[in-house]
Amino acid sequence: MIDITHKPTTLREATATALVTVSDPATITAVQEKRVPKGDVLESARVAALFGVKKTHELIPDCHPLPIEHAEVGFTIGAQEITVTMRVRTIYRTGVEVEAMHGASVAALTIYDMLKPIDKGVAIGGIRLAEKK
């Protein structure tokens, strides 16, 4: 792990996104109407994203354990896609970019897992860091 003891403690922010696409608009309708057999897709993905952010250092070898001061996840629903937006903030010596991307990824995987029984064409793509401060 890189030595960060010499770095100053400052406000660190990162926003990441992930895109989940579906093959049938009826899948999006099922999500919106909470008719997916496995349960409430967006609430499950929200909880999973928060767990993902908090556990990043346990799964990514060179990530430091750091205090997560704020984490929020949002969902933008389109005709055949759901965009996950994950924002993370801390006051620490290192950034939270990987934590934000990990949270967005875990949310996307949760959505995928919950939708695969009703839509065999679900796909995840476009996981990226949208902003870093």
Residue ranges and their predicted role:
Residues 1-64, 69-133:
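C-terminal binding/interaction regions
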